[in-house]
Amino acid sequence: MTLTSLAVRRFAPDGPPAGPPVLLLHGFASDGPTDWISTGWPSALTAAGRPVLVPDLPGHGSSPALADTTPKAIAEELAAAVGHVSDVDVVGYSLGARLAWELPAVLPVRRLVLGGLSPHEPFGAVDVEAALAFAAGGRLPADPLTAAIARMITAPGRDPAALARCIEGLRREPFAPEAGALTVPTRFVAGRDDPVSQGIETLVPLVPGSDLLTVPGDHGGALRGAPFRTAALAFLTTP
């Protein structure tokens, strides 16, 4: 197994594996237990015979921040966490979906499920300095987006400096999806009331053979709801 600095929780089925491992990638300012373990994903996947890997992204949860927090650098670190496998399925949500987009370049990805994905770079307009000033005891930023990010990075248990560094790295490689960038079977999933993934349907024509399912809920509700998990499991268990 390749060494990695990331905290990774691994789950195994009771019997022989029925398919490749599944890598679950959480959203910004969250962690693996919050997004995946508490919502029952490892239990559902191992019951279907699948090994599961649940990392904390760099600077999130129990994982230290990386010096380089660009999407490509994080993808390389995630590939190291997975190690040498012949195939892997990936489910990403929000930031996790953004990073999952990069993984077929560095991992033998068999299938992708991308949930809650913004078709645009979501951090481009964030005033990182203002968010950090709030974290240091200053005023809440007037800009609504920056204020929302400021609240996220100062939530209990979060590391504001590490999360701000993550934002800065992501902005150095803005999300600019192009036709043909993904060639693996892909399912997009979006909450019906999720403003973050508004416009996600524009990504479907860029990925040959992909589809889009809409499930109930806003950005957080869609992640926690059973319909998203059901849609992902159905796609991942397709031969």
State the predicted function of each range:
Residues 98-139:
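Flexible "cap/lid" loop of the alpha/beta hydrolase fold
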Residues 29-42:
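The serine-hydrolase catalytic nucleophile loop
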Residues 162-178, 193-195:
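Active-site nucleophile elbow and catalytic-triad environment of alpha/beta-hydrolase enzymes
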Residues 26-31, 94:
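Active-site glycine-rich loops that stabilize anionic/oxyanionic intermediates
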Residues 45-64:
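Conserved alpha/beta-hydrolase
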Residues 72-88:
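Conserved acidic catalytic loop of the alpha/beta-hydrolase fold
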Residues 217-229:
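Catalytic histidine-centered segment of alpha/beta-hydrolase-like enzymes
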Residues 182, 188-190:
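Short beta-strand/loop motif that positions the catalytic acidic residue
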